[in-house]
Amino acid sequence: MAISAKDVMELRKQTDCGMMECKKALTEADGNFEKAIEILRERGLATAAKKASRVAAEGMVYADYCPACKVGVVIEVNAETDFVAKNDKFVDFVKEATKVIMKQNPADVEALMACKTEAGETVDEALKNLILVIKENIKVRRFTRYEGVCSAYVHGGGTHGILVNFETTNDIDAKDEFVAYGKDIAMQVAAANPSYVDEASVPAEVVAKEKEIMLAQMAGDPKNANKPDAVKQKMIEGKIKKFFKENCLVDQEFVKDGDLSVAQYTAKVAKDLGGDIKIVKFTRFQKGEGLEKRADDFAAEVASMVK
C-alpha cells in the first residue's frame, strides 16, 4: 500500500526515528502504526514503551474528591477551541456534571446525560443550552468515579486530571499530612505517567511482549552472538526490572525525592501517621488524548444537537 508523507511524519514524531526508517516500518506493517512502532522497537530504533497519542481536541479535564462522602471523580469535556475552557459557564457545567456523577453514580456518559442536575434539568439539556450560548460543539467524553479514600489533582489549568484511590487504616486519611501525601502521589502520576500501580497489575501478555521485543533487539546485535544463554537471561531480567521501574507507579523514582521510590515514600508516610497506606488504582486523563481536530462542519453538528 502507498504510505503518505503525513503518516511518515506522524510516526517520526511518535518515535524520533529517521524518515526512511519510519517509511520502511510503515511499509512492512501495511500502514499499521502500532505494528510499525513494534518493528522499530525490535530493531532497537525506538525505545518508547507506551503508545504515543495525537492530542488535538480542546476543552478541559477536571477532578474532584468529596472527603465527607469518600467519592472521587475525574472527567473530560471537549470543545472546539482552547478559550472555551476559560469560559465561566463552561467551567460551571463541568463542575455540575462532576457533582452529578458523584451523587448519582451513572454507569457511563449516556446514563449521565439522562441524570438530573440540581437545577432540575437533565445534563443533556444543560449541555444543549450551553452549546446555544457558547456556539461551539461540546461533548462529555469520559469520566471515572472511585469510591473510598481518594486524591484528586488538576494540572495545567485542566490539561491533565488525576484521580488516585487508596486503602488506609486508623483514619489517617483525615490528617493533613495524608492529604499532602495524596497530592504528591497524584502529581507523580501526572508527571511520570505510569501505566500500572505495581508489577502484579501488569498483564502477563504485556510482560511476554516486552520480553519478545527485548530478545529481538538482542538477536539483532552482533555483540550478543557469543554470549551464553544464562548471560542473556540475566540481561532480559535486568531490562524487565527497568521496564517495571519506568511503568509501575510504586516502583518509580519519587519525583520530589530521587533517593526514594514511591513505595518507600508511601511506607515512610504510613509509619509517620501510624497506619497503613495502599495505592489501589489511579486514572490519568490528558485533555484530547487520542483525538484529532476534524475538518467536519461543526456548525451543522451543533445545529443538529440543539434541535
Q: Where on the chain are the PLM-derived regions?
A:
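N-terminal assembly/interaction segments in proteins that build large macromolecular machines
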Residues: 2-307
